[in-house]
Amino acid sequence: MASFKGFSANTVPVSKTRKDTSSLTATPGLRAPSMSSPVDMAQSREFLTKAIEHGSMSIPYQHVNVPKVDRKVVSLVVRPFSAGAFSISGVISPAHAYLLECLPQLEQAMAFVASPEAFQASDVAKRFTIKPGMSLQDAITAFINFVSAMLKMTVTRQNFDVIIAEIERLASSGVVNRTEEAKVADEELMLFGLDHRAPQQIDVSEPVGISRAVEIQTTNNVHLAPGLGNIDPEIYNEGRFMFMQHKPLAADQSYFTTETADYFKIYPTYDEHDGRMVDQKQSGLILCTKDEVLAEQTIFKLDVPDDKTVHLLDRDDDHVVARFTRVFIEDVAPSHHAAQRSNQRSLLDDLYANTQVVSVTPSALRWVIKHGVSDGIVNRKNVKICVGFDPLYTLATSNGLSLCSILMDEKLSVLNSACKMTLRSLLKTHRDLDLHRAFQRVISQSYASLMCYYHPSRKLAYGELLFMSSQSDTVDGIKLQLDASRQCHECPLLQQKIVELEKHLIVQKSASSDPTPVALQPLLSQLRELSSEVTRLQMDLSRTQAINTRLEADVKSAQSCSLDMYLKHHTCINSHVKEDELMDAVRIAPDVRQELMLKRKATRQEWWERIARETSTTFQSKIDELTLMNGKQAHEISELRDSVTNYEKQVAELVSTITQNQTTYQQELQALVAKNIELDALNQRQAKSVRITSSLLSATPIDAVDGASDLIDFSVPADEL
């Protein structure tokens, strides 16, 4: 018998090989069949009935493995119209348990969702495409989002057939025939038992079977997805965190390609080739409050053509660098919260169905938490949330990042019980004013120097833009710290100015009548640059020295005017060595420190003696009172001891008397017993000596007893009636 590439001649259908599960276990997405024998419930009930009828209480116990029907592992085969079929498997959540009743219809629907070309390559259809490697629950989520976005319908058991019909009608104009490669993939799935249809056996002993096996093995587009294959939760959450900070390229682009592409079509982006901000055409979505000022959260000009539209304009030529649709959180969050409770569709669901990237302002996050309607706002699988709408504002201030992160972790009901103090600290710190003031200092910088932070590759150039420093000459101590690692090619405007200045310098040199040799001109140029640099450094040094002089004067003035006066009039008893070190740290003179320490020691001794006297006076009366009470208690104890001794003597006398009486009574008892024995013997002797004979009896005849005839014989029954 011939064999080829793992297909043996004795290959049998999978349905007949229930005991051999080694190959099935290794197959991705297929669960091994249970080895426990099935239980015949009818036979068990019959056996139990007979045992009860015959009076037998000995019923054998049989262990039955009951599967959890609510978490059943389901395997489906998705057959796209222009690609190879693949298998997905997993558990269906209890919320979607009704899908277990309509698995064939679900497979049919997923085939459409996995074929976006059937809908004329719609962007919405591409966004929710079911792909190989998805888990079953992710595929169901993609299907539900597809129905929500394309059909504006909610998936339920009642309208499932209607949804299938609508999808077929919508795709009727774009459906293509399945390719030959897709059919080959179906055969491979059936071979490994992953298809719901009957498995087909390939007989490799025949030339046709061998060619069929070769065709299956060499097919390129066949993909068997792992049943439980899914995006790593750590990669997914890391990607969400990067989008939240406006760093989309820092996310894993093998999973977030479409979201990243949409991001750079919406948000301000710098084009280094044109040397200007890109004129964006696609509109994004902003969730904000009605009373917040959006102009304080961006470095661009803000244009509001109407109540629902916001444009960000370039500060140089006023072209549009970003377009947004403004939605007030007060109008959509409460209705969305109510719709979630009644299992209905809300306006926010419709808005989220048409976009992948949404901006939420920090004020909107605080509003939904304060009013208890935050569930389902930021924690959505098909939407990536960005805090704020200007990347520079979010990365400079980090305002709202902590609130958004904690809302992505848990529902508000859990946070109010487990993280209540954390929420309180995030909501009541009132840092918005300080952050807005800090961001105004960023805006005051050169507009051209800030453009590099809107470059798509900013994931490697972004550092902390703002940091706090406690300096004496500034209240907030906020400085702009540009990342020194960015390259000059990120600042083309500066490069252009440098080229123009070099050209201008060459023209000036050629026009001047400087007799300096050409070889020395570069050295002189460097010398001039060094001279200007030295001049600048000298100016900085002078400025720093002036600041230091002013600070020293302030310290001396504060020391002489306030600290010395305080130490002179302050009464303190702390004479520890650490106090001397602290006064030395604030620059107190040594003689003053010694005088203060001696004064404190004397004051401490004085107070110690005073407290000792007051304490002894206060407690002397209590000590006398306790001594008197102690004497009284000792006298009472002595009296009690005497009375106890008397009682013991009386008890001893009573015991002696009782003992004597007991001895006397025993002697008398013994005498009585002896007397009794003696009398008994005498009585017996007298009885033996006296004999009753017939001569002693009377010869008089016995007379009848009077009234003997009237006696009733009770042995004879009589009728009492």
From Swiss-Prot:
* Heme as UniProt keyword: no
Give the function comment from the record.
Non-structural protein implicated with protein sigma-NS in forming the matrix of viral factories, which are large inclusions in the host cytoplasm where replication intermediates are assembled and viral RNA replication takes place. Together with mu-2, recruits the other core proteins to these factories.
Q: What is this protein called?
A: Protein mu-NS
Q: Which family does it belong to?
A: Belongs to the orthoreovirus mu-NS protein family.
Q: How is it modified after translation?
A: The N-terminus is blocked.
Q: Where is this site: Important for the formation of viral factories?
A: H570, C572
- Chain intervals for the UniProt region annotation (Involved in the formation of factory-like inclusions): 471-721
Parts forming coiled coils: 523-556, 632-686
Q: Where is this region: RNA-binding?
A: 1-38
Per the record, which residues fall in region Disordered? 17-37
Q: Which GO terms describe its molecular function?
A: RNA binding
Q: Where in the cell is it found?
A: Host cytoplasm
Annotated S-S bridges = none
Q: Where is this region: Interaction with sigma-NS?
A: 1-13
Q: Which GO terms describe its cellular component?
A: host cell cytoplasm
Main localization, broad class: host cell
Q: Cite the record's note on assembly.
A: Interacts with mu-2. Interacts with sigma-NS; in viral factories. Interacts with the inner capsid proteins lambda-1 and sigma-2, and outer capsid protein lambda-2; in viral factories.
The answer on whether this UniProt entry bears the keyword Iron-sulfur reads no
Keyword entries, A-Z: Coiled coil, Host cytoplasm, RNA-binding
Q: What is known of its domains?
A: The C-terminus is involved in the formation of factory-like inclusions.
Q: Where is this region: Interaction with mu-2?
A: 14-40
**Species assigned in the record:** Reovirus type 2 (strain D5/Jones)
